[in-house]
Amino acid sequence: MTNNEIIAATDGSSLANPGPSGWAWYVDENTWDSGGWDIATNNIAELTAVRELLIATRHTDRPILILSDSKYVINSLTKWVYSWKMRKWRKADGKPVLNQEIIQEIDSLMENRNIRMSWVNAHTGHPLNEAADSLARQAANNFSTRSAHIPGPGWTERSAK
């Protein structure tokens, strides 16, 4: 870790998979965001959290460490994406890559940026992961009950530690 590296946790939640779903990214109490839908899968929610973090931070040149409890997301974005691109977005079995559109978008957002990803074990007390998990679950619950969803403050260089 460098001293100006942004450390952010991302998480997604789907109540029925597919069902009411939420996503969140979290840096600190002043720097986070969340959202969701009436129906989506957990993987779409997890990927959306990463995409939204990368969009929010697109104007910073600081390195970013993304913490995720989704091995699917980490493997998709750091390992499998290279072979999928070589195979024209087909898996080894010849079938199309699931969630291809959002994975392509994230891959583009990661281009020419210093982005690292690291897996964290879910629900083990990691403070950033727990915060992102809570916000994603709250967003999913808001969409489930059709309650108003209030997004977070988002990203500014000044607010991020």
From Swiss-Prot:
Binding site for Mg(2+) 2: 11, 133
GO-annotated cellular components: cytoplasm
Record's keyword annotation contains Hydrolase: yes
Record-listed E.C. numbers: 3.1.26.4
Cofactor note text: Binds 1 Mg(2+) ion per subunit. May bind a second metal ion at a regulatory site, or after substrate binding.
Co-factor requirement: Mg(2+)
Catalytic activity field: Endonucleolytic cleavage to 5'-phosphomonoester
GO molecular function: magnesium ion binding; nucleic acid binding; RNA-DNA hybrid ribonuclease activity
Pfam families attached to this UniProt entry: RNase_H
Amino-acid positions noted as binding Mg(2+) 1 in the UniProt annotation, renumbered to this chain: 11, 46, 69
SUPFAM superfamilies for this protein: Ribonuclease H-like (SSF53098)
Coiled-coil intervals, chain numbering: none
PROSITE patterns recorded: RNASE_H_1
Localization: Cytoplasm
CDD domains assigned to the protein according to its UniProt record, in alphabetical order: RNase_HI_prokaryote_like
Keywords: Cytoplasm, Endonuclease, Hydrolase, Magnesium, Metal-binding, Nuclease
Chief site of localization: cytoplasm
Family assignment from sequence similarity: Belongs to the RNase H family.
Biological function: Endonuclease that specifically degrades the RNA of RNA-DNA hybrids.
Protein name: Ribonuclease H
Protein source organism: Tropheryma whipplei (strain Twist) (Whipple's bacillus)
